[in-house]
């Protein structure tokens, strides 16, 4: 299985690479965080089409949530590009989101079935990203 990992230099990327390599069942094709700051859709097309991928694992946004460069509209646009290409090529997509999609106002633990209700800009952007992915893709796991 050929897996494209977006955010290979993230903690999750390092762990995934360390876990998958000894098993030799999966080929990890990694893209570091800085290299995912695409400015044009063409850059994403080249990345996707040059590889014969079985899965896209997107760890970009969960990694940069509390980073120096906050999650914002450029990330939403990049996600649109990725979703469109993954749908066209019929590549399953695994997106790592965050609990930031919830406001934290409930007095009980949140469930997967709870409606995202974030009010902060990062949480709202993550909600928009999840919406873009679920609308564009048949095979999406968030």
Predicted segment positions?
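N-terminal Rossmann NAD(P)H-binding glycine-rich loop of SDR-like oxidoreductase domains
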Residues: 1-24
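Active-site beta-alpha turn of Rossmann-fold NAD(P)-dependent dehydrogenases/reductases
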Residues: 7, 60, 97-98, 119, ...
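A short beta-strand-loop structural module common to alpha/beta enzyme folds
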Residues: 26-38
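Hydrophobic beta-strand scaffold residues
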Residues: 28, 55, 93, 140-141
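NAD(P)H-binding glycine-rich loop region in Rossmannoid oxidoreductase-like domains
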Residues: 35-78, 85-87
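Active-site "gating" loop of Rossmann-like NAD(P)-dependent oxidoreductase/epimerase domains
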Residues: 62-73, 99-120
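Short alpha-helix in the Rossmann-fold core of NAD(P)-dependent oxidoreductases
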Residues: 71-79, 94, 122-126
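Conserved beta-loop-beta element that borders a ligand/cofactor-binding pocket
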Residues: 94, 98-100, 130-142
């Amino acid at each position: 299985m050929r897996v494209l990992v977006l955010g290979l230099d993230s903690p999750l990327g390092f762990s995934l690479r360390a876990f998958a390599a000894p098993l030799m069942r999966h080929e990890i094709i990694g893209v570091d965080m800085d290299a995912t700051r695409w400015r044009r859709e063409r850059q994403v097309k080249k990345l996707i089409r040059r590889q014969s991928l079985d899965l896209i694992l997107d760890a970009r946004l969960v990694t940069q949530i509390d980073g120096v460069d906050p999650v914002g509209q450029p990330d939403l646009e990049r996600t649109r590009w990725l979703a469109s290409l993954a749908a066209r090529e019929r590549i399953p997509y695994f997106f790592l989101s965050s609990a930031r999609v919830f406001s934290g106002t409930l007095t009980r633990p949140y469930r997967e079935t709870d409606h995202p209700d974030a009010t902060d800009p990062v949480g709202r952007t993550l909600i928009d990203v999840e919406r873009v992915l679920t609308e564009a893709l048949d095979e999406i796991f968030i």
